[in-house]
């Protein structure tokens, strides 16, 4: 497979503000989780039980080097608050959750906000009924939309394309979404969870448009599959 081409490697490592350590004591974290859970339970009397609330923090250091002379690294941090509860009505029970993740703990919403949203989401699931088969517009909430985009990213990945196991083989330049859909890859957004100055081969990350007005504009390829497919990483 070989290394990525030397001219594609990152020449500099920009500061993307990915590292914001959170020196929180365990007792303080427990207090935040308790506030979060209480807000969920207090949201509605139909919220009857909790599956738990959590507060977490992590720090990491990513370093990559190769025999082309590349050596780069950067620190990063992730902090989160989450809560999951159970609601009951007329003998039926539903479970849902809410969470928040940020590079900087100062950017997290208040624990009570996370808990209240967990309660709201759970109660909203009560009383649902099945629809008859129909053709109708569908509005996807952000949580579901992220999953749909995840399926797109899997379908345009090098391995799936090379094995021809993707439904988007030979789809470059063709419509794959409605014309109102545009999807950008923006790896240099400060504090963003997936921002990075280089990929896992040391290749410099760049902004690009994956879908433009519904038309597929690019694939996600590492060096190995890019060479197999006669394309660029």
Predicted regions and their residues:
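Active-site bordering "gate/hinge" segments
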Residues: 1-207, 212-215
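C-terminal, non-catalytic macromolecule-binding modules
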Residues: 215-233
């Amino acid at each position: 497979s070989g290394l990525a081409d030397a001219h594609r490697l990152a020449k500099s490592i920009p500061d993307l503000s990915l590292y914001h350590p959170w020196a929180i004591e365990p007792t303080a974290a427990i207090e935040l989780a308790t506030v979060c859970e209480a807000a969920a339970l207090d949201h509605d009397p139909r919220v009857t039980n909790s599956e738990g609330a959590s507060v977490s923090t992590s720090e990491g250091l990513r370093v990559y080097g190769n025999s082309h002379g590349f050596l780069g690294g950067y620190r990063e941090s992730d902090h989160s608050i989450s809560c999951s509860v159970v609601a009951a009505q007329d003998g039926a029970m539903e479970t849902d959750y809410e969470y928040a993740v940020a590079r900087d703990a100062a950017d997290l919403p208040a624990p009570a906000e996370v808990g209240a949203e967990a309660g709201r989401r759970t109660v909203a699931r009560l009383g649902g009924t099945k629809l008859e088969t129909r053709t109708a517009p569908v509005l996807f909430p952000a949580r579901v939309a992220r999953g749909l985009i995840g399926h797109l990213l899997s379908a345009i990945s090098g391995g799936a394309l090379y094995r021809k196991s993707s439904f988007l083989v030979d789809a470059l330049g063709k419509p794959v979404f409605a014309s109102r859909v545009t999807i950008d890859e923006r790896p240099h957004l400060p504090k963003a969870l997936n921002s990075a100055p280089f990929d896992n081969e040391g290749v410099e990350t760049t902004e690009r448009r994956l879908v433009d007005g519904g038309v597929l504009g690019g694939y996600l390829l590492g060096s190995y599959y890019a060479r197999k497919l006669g394309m660029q990483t």
